[in-house]
């Protein structure tokens, strides 16, 4: 409550009044083992919230935005379990597992949709309310996001304003602008997907670990001891580098997670000495 987090919000669009619930899944929490936040069981939490909505709100639809995900094994598929356990949900917009569902999953009167990952698709669907008050999915498609789509001018103006804010309030402290070119690249770096699926040496990880070493050895706090190993957690890598110009924005996108104790965006870089004794 101190951070303005609500159990649900009610949205009015035309003649339709919908309650939207958000939930964080079990596997998602396990992916952040050092997280100090504690969550209720997602199914029980959503069930309780839906009961509250039914009691206190007159809505036509209940939608759930979930970071639970879907798996091939239906018995382990968190959002499918959620659909079965909380049948009053009309629509689950699923995330976390990056699943690209070409067709919606249906359990009872609940539909589950997911459009993949990294903004590559836009999900579009239509639903029609039935006589019993529930909803039927009448159309659903994934629209690839490409340069063929003409930008909406009003939305683009908002994006440009936010980008200017990033330049002024963040990057200017380091003497950079987001479009500034840092390097020319002629290397075919590994894709982001390969970082998470290939358990082997990758050139994307190599350049990032080399950057860690460079940053430590050029820090004002460097004590002169050589750096033997640099560790790059693959889950924190959020972008790769394509051939051509590498800009400040490209580099930031590849390391865009986290925040330091000083409030500055980005995980802090730390150095440590590992001691061992000979057998």
Which positions does each model-derived feature cover?
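Acidic, metal/ion-coordinating pockets
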Residues: 1-148
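Solvent-exposed loop/linker segments at secondary-structure transitions
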Residues: 54, 126-278
